[in-house]
Curated annotation (Swiss-Prot):
[4Fe-4S] cluster binds at D36. Keywords: 4Fe-4S, ATP-binding, Chlorophyll biosynthesis, Chloroplast, Iron, Iron-sulfur, Metal-binding, Nucleotide-binding, Oxidoreductase, Photosynthesis, Plastid. It is an enzyme of class 1 (oxidoreductase). It comes from Chaetosphaeridium globosum (Charophycean green alga). InterPro entries: ChlB/BchB/BchZ, LI-POR_suB-like_C, Nase/OxRdtase_comp1, P-CP_red_C, Protochl_reductB, Protochlorophyllide_Rdtase. Protochlorophyllide reductase is composed of three subunits; ChlL, ChlN and ChlB. Forms a heterotetramer of two ChlB and two ChlN subunits. This is Light-independent protochlorophyllide reductase subunit B. It is found in: Plastid, Chloroplast. Binds 1 [4Fe-4S] cluster per heterodimer. The cluster is bound at the heterodimer interface by residues from both subunits. Its EC number is 1.3.7.7.
Amino acid sequence: MKLAYWMYAGPAHIGTLRVASSFKNVHAIMHAPLGDDYFNVMRSMLERERDFTPVTASIVDRHVLARGSQEKVVENITRKDQEENPDLIVLTPTCTSSILQEDLQNFVNRSSMSSKCDVILADVNHYRVNELQAADRTLEQIIKYYLNDAVKQKNVDRSITEYPSVNIIGFFTLGFHQQHDCRELKRLFNDLGIQINQIIPEGGSVTDIKNLPNAWFNVVPYREIGLMTATFLEKEFGMPYVSTTPMGIVDTAKFIRELQFYVNFYALEKIGYKVNYESYIDQQTRFVSQAAWFSRSIDCQNLTGKKAFVYGDSTHAVSMTKILSREMGINVICAGTYCKQDSQWFKEQVSEYCEQILITDNHTEVGDMIAKLEPSAIFGTQMERHIGKRLGIPCGVISAPVHIQNFPLSYRPFLGYEGTNQIADLVYNSFTLGMEDHLLEIFGGHDTKEVITKSLSTDLDLTWTMESQKELSKIPGFVRGKIKRNTEKYAREKGITSITVEVMYAAKESLSA
């Protein structure tokens, strides 16, 4: 546990609550002190949904500390069972309440005796895992619980559906553009004649989990959640899975070819012929997606060789790095992720597409790297957007964590062929057009930016004279920030505290020497 101003992945209980509140008719009870119960507010504010968040906080207060939690927790579980009539109640502590070292499994066993619904304790180590790891683990735990129970009762139909079908595993609440990605994947599967057996956890029902083995195979769009469940289903029920993320022209085509491979396992036996999706890939790439055409246009060629910095969760950071490098010819000077648990896979995927790799969940390290590399554009999370604003570098948001702007009402997927159009727009609009900025500064107007670009670490020990500020304002905006930082670096090295025009020229000469 650590105290942080900013965390890319939240504490473990948030991941558990995200999974539990994604299912239909599942209620979560959070055993937590006041202050840890912000999930309801966060979800209500960010998700564009009409339903109340099905999470109740069982508050740890002074009375609980004096008498113990059992009575209160059992009472809350029983009450919610009667009021809401859920199929499942998930009990989770938080990292704070875990300090009490209470036997919560015993509370669950006690309450199960008097409850009509199933009750389980989230099996997560709150000190060892983060939000995404906990979400993956909780989803696997729920799937295992119901499938193992169905196997015991001999209530599992292992026969596959008559027509090609798929389970989509990993869409859940508060995900980055996931509602839109889900719609896009549904459309893609419909075009390919593949039926959707189940989507879990988003909108899924725990009573239907026993039917998961009826699908021909599983799809896991994001590495962060779903892989543990897919691995379990493969091991126990022999269900193959596709884990390629269909983001960008190249990977979407690869994804569809993998679907074709698995559909053809049973195609002859079930539908009498083997499928071929090559004509669909060609049609979509050339006529539906504008990205392939755009990447050959003069607009995109203007971006060739531009420097970009990419950072986010492993799925989006890898996909974005590949798209920028191989589909748009943009130089990715650094690709990074905060998913340290997935660092090996991340390095394997991006090593040939970028110059540097950054594996860290410390936002100050990310900010310092951006300030040092001075890219033309940043593609990252909400935090990188803040960093970009302070440095005067444009930023496109491509990964969670994000704020309300990235829960749009309009249709903006990142997956599939429509997603390629969205990404192409985001990339092109993220790069500052240097001449545009320069003209605005020449002619003035409400868009005129501040003369001096702010640096990430504000140097209070350096002052610019009026003359040097005036001289700096004559420099075009797209290189001004770099010149300012180089001048300040030179001044610090020489022990100068007041930057004059002469110091500016001396700094320039020292660089060109």
